């Protein structure tokens, strides 16, 4: 196996692991990293990105395996465990439905560098606004989120279908806007990542099944494992961070990255097509 390709795969796994759960959009960063490193052909990169996203998802599953098992086991009887299971299902449904109905439109019409840049910049401004004017937490326990709160966060997650918006950004800031504490909305966002990434990955994997080749399994495994461990570390670090800090730094970063997308798209330095 080519050593340079291995290094590139590790870097891509690191990028995915860092950006998947932070409110900064993993997609834009993966496109940038892949273009700068000239990483794989388009078709092979699609498959690789599916695998590193699954690595990120499984890191969440492993971290919360006890709570997930309790939630699944308690789904048939009243209690906090069933409440979490139902809330995740409620929040998952709106984005799943909209994504299923409009997936072709999103890929063919919305995925332009200018939409991506707009998603980054507008998302950054919204984070600033919520942090400064709309954050009034009334609930600090993810297990006690109401069905209405879950549905509202699910509606916010629909905005993440706009490229550059960020799934985690939409759900975290949406949760904060509707009265969840930073930690509660961040943890709930982690849980929502499981069905969203899982469903999207399985669908994308089925569509890309003809591009999968046995000789690529080594590089796919490297990306998967790297993403798993980096996501695991970032997940814990983010929860420690939000217990003491706001999301304002991420807002400024989003705006700066959005301007970078605009500049590189206008000059043609980076190919932002997918």
From Swiss-Prot:
It comes from Cellvibrio japonicus (strain Ueda107) (Pseudomonas fluorescens subsp. cellulosa). Its main location: membrane. It is a multi-pass membrane protein. This is Undecaprenyl-diphosphatase. Belongs to the UppP family. It catalyses: di-trans,octa-cis-undecaprenyl diphosphate + H2O = di-trans,octa-cis-undecaprenyl phosphate + phosphate + H(+). Its EC number is 3.6.1.27. It is found in: Cell inner membrane. Catalyzes the dephosphorylation of undecaprenyl diphosphate (UPP). Confers resistance to bacitracin. GO terms for biological process: cell wall organization; peptidoglycan biosynthetic process; regulation of cell shape; response to antibiotic. The keyword Transport does not apply. It holds the Pfam family BacA. The keyword Cell wall biogenesis/degradation applies. The chain crosses the membrane at residues 4-24, 46-66, 86-106, 109-129, 145-165, 188-208, 214-234, 250-270. Bacitracin is thought to be involved in the inhibition of peptidoglycan synthesis by sequestering undecaprenyl diphosphate, thereby reducing the pool of lipid carrier available. It comes from the Bacteria. The gene is uppP.
């Amino acid at each position: 196996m080519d050593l340079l390709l291995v290094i590139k795969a590790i870097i891509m796994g690191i990028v995915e692991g860092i950006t998947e759960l932070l409110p900064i959009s993993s997609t834009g960063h993966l496109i940038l990293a892949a273009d700068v490193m000239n990483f794989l052909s388009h078709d092979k990169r699609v498959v690789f990105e599916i695998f590193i996203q699954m690595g990120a998802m499984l890191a969440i599953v492993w971290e919360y395996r006890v709570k997930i098992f309790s939630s699944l086991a308690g789904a048939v009887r009243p209690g906090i465990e069933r409440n979490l299971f139902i809330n995740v299902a409620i929040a998952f449904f709106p984005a799943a439905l909209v994504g299923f109905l409009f997936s072709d439109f999103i890929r063919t019409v919305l995925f332009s560098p200018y939409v991506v840049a707009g998603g980054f910049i507008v998302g950054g401004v919204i984070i600033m606004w919520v942090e400064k004017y709309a954050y009034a937490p009334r609930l600090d326990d993810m297990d006690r989120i109401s069905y209405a709160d879950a549905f509202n966060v699910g509606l916010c997650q629909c905005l993440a279908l706009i490229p550059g918006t960020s799934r985690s950004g939409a759900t975290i800031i949406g949760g904060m806007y509707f009265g969840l504490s930073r930690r509660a909305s961040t943890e709930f966002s982690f849980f929502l990542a499981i069905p969203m990434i899982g469903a999207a990955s399985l669908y994308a994997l089925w569509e890309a099944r003809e591009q999968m080749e046995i000789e690529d399994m080594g590089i796919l495994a490297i990306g998967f494992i790297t993403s798993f461990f980096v996501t695991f570390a970032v997940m814990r670090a983010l929860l420690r961070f939000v217990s003491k800090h706001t999301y304002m730094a991420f807002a400024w970063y989003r705006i700066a990255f959005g301007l970078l997308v605009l500049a590189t798209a206008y000059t043609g330095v980076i190919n932002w097509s997918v």
